[in-house]
Design a protein with these regions (language model features):
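Short beta-strand-to-loop elements that line the ligand-binding cleft
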Residues: 19-25, 102-111
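A late-sequence structural motif
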Residues: 3, 144-185
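Flexible hinge/capping segments at coil-to-helix
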Residues: 51-84, 94
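Secondary-structure junction motif
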Residues: 78-99, 163-166
Length: 195
């Protein structure tokens, strides 16, 4: 998310001598790394009601396709998804299976840029948080034959021995997500919900 990148930049300017290392992994892997005390902090996506960390944000989850292509009409439906263990992937597959709609996983990536590359090129459909849809990508809904999706909760988790610096970064993340949600609600009329 742009807001996450902005938050990291804000923190880096405030603490130029602190080196932050970022891992982009499925939530299941992040939980394992936290349990092994190999991460100080993790942002984990889950369904509201299943949160175990500090909820930073809740937002609508949408099916997404390129504005200028018709991948969403293909049979079987081509999908660009995150790796196994990601809730967005699970929600997409469960939704399509529930409809009995044929699909194929055409692209798999651990990063949002990899998923969006396939979608913006018109090669696949994906499931994402509404706030991360870039220009040229639009949401799909029931009128186009796509099932509803659960909202996403973005939660902050801490490792076993978190330093004062990591707690400070957690504070920056909290503030960054709050500012992003406010900005999103003011510009789109589709607010993300702060916890």
């Amino acid at each position: 998310q742009a807001g996450f990148g902005d938050t990291l930049a804000w923190f880096a300017r405030a603490f130029p001598r602190v080196q932050v290392e970022v891992h982009c992994e499925p939530s299941v892997n992040l939980r394992r790394l936290l349990a092994e005390d190999r991460l100080d902090l993790a942002l984990i996506t889950c369904t509201p009601g299943a949160e175990t960390g500090e909820v930073l944000r809740r937002e609508p989850t949408v099916w997404a396709t390129a504005e200028r292509h018709l991948a969403h009409e293909d049979e079987p439906l081509p999908l660009a998804l995150f790796q196994a263990g990601c809730p967005f992937r699970d929600w997409a597959l469960a939704g399509l299976s529930g409809l009995g709609r044929p699909y194929r996983i055409a692209y798999t990536s651990a990063s949002i840029s990899g998923v969006l590359a396939a979608v913006t090129a018109g090669l696949a459909v994906t499931v994402l948080g509404r706030s991360v849809l870039p220009a040229g990508v639009r949401p799909l809904g029931a009128a186009e034959g796509f099932p509803p999706l659960p909202p996403a909760s973005i939660t902050l988790h801490r490792g076993g021995s978190v330093s004062a610096v990591a707690e400070c970064l957690a504070g920056y993340m909290r503030e960054g997500f709050a500012a992003e949600a406010l900005s999103s609600s003011m510009s789109t009329g589709n607010p993300a919900i702060l916890a």
